[in-house]
Curated annotation (Swiss-Prot):
It is found in: Cytoplasm. It comes from Staphylococcus epidermidis (strain ATCC 35984 / DSM 28319 / BCRC 17069 / CCUG 31568 / BM 3577 / RP62A). Pathway: Carbohydrate degradation; glycolysis; pyruvate from D-glyceraldehyde 3-phosphate: step 2/5. Belongs to the phosphoglycerate kinase family. It catalyses: (2R)-3-phosphoglycerate + ATP = (2R)-3-phospho-glyceroyl phosphate + ADP. It comes from the Bacteria. Monomer. This is Phosphoglycerate kinase. SUPFAM superfamilies: Phosphoglycerate kinase (SSF53748).
Amino acid sequence: MAKKIVSDLDLKGKVVLERADFNVPIKDGEITNDNRIVQALPTIEYIIEQGGKLVLFSHLGKVKEESDKEGLSLKPVAENLSKKLGKEVIFVPETRGEKLETAIENLNEGDVLLVENTRFEDLDGKKESKNDPELGKYWASLGDVFVNDAFGTAHREHASNVGISTHLETAAGYLMEKEIKFIGGVVNDPQKPVVAILGGAKVSDKINVIKNLVNIADKILIGGGMAYTFIKAQGKEIGLSLLEEDKIDFAKDLLENNGDQIVLPVDCKIAKEFSNDAKITEVSINEIPSDQEAMDIGPKTVELFNKELQGAHTVVWNGPMGVFEFSNFAKGTIGVCESIAKLEDATTIIGGGDSAAAAISLGFEDDFTHISTGGGASLEYLEGKELPGIKAINDK
């Protein structure tokens, strides 16, 4: 069933509550990457144009004790958003109370107000993170309709997403709509052939994704640290490379039952120490010495993965191919990123997290059909789970 989107709502003159995802990195009071704010703009601008009185909610970081509040205020977000919109964003440094209620009552059509970090409510019994029913009800009482545009927290059942939805007509914002269309589309109705590329350090982080994707993807290309548990499961020596002993049986079973779908590295770059300055050797996957560890996939693997991608109609990528934060071990990730970016007839999707950061930093942002804003949310969606934040949005 299709979900309601913001354009299905009558917004003029209404107090529109919106859950956005402004969980951006802030250092010394300065936002170091405002991509999430940029992604939120289409929905915010639409609500303003339609004459809604916009009240924005978001969390920022984890608030465990009173001293955390100082560095986790949303005030820098209000300033950044204000510049982008070319108008004042009223910032209320409270999450409830008379000051907030009065500020909302005084809003005019097209005004924008940002409520302080919703996780400040976690200092009192984790009311936000545990979806305290009274808090959700209180926030809902401040508005007329609710728009959820925070895919990054769609896998969480919080007061500021699911809690508010319980009491108000709820629609998806444009960013949430895109995530449902593309990430949800991979799971529910992908255009075949489908190729999935999985990387990152641990098999354990991706087990449920793999279990779901073997029923969807024609090929699953595995790189990153997680590949070496599979290579060990084939009976090969992996030296000091990353290994999850307790996942070898899972890897063996998968290779036995779905071996024709799984594509593993054929070569890698190894080093004796975990450092960007370490001496690099390129070796076949069968020749990793006992005193060295694999830090990146090699050029032959990049070539192999590129070959496997040709002819795909849907490609989903989650996780880097090596220790991407070290420039000398980033070539595998860069190579795979370039291969996907060059595909002309495919829907290409990055499932958030480190791969999204890699594609953006490499300047390939515009070459992908969709780069997800959710890390954990993307993974859980790819696992085939129904996400609470999406479930709570009204059907059309």
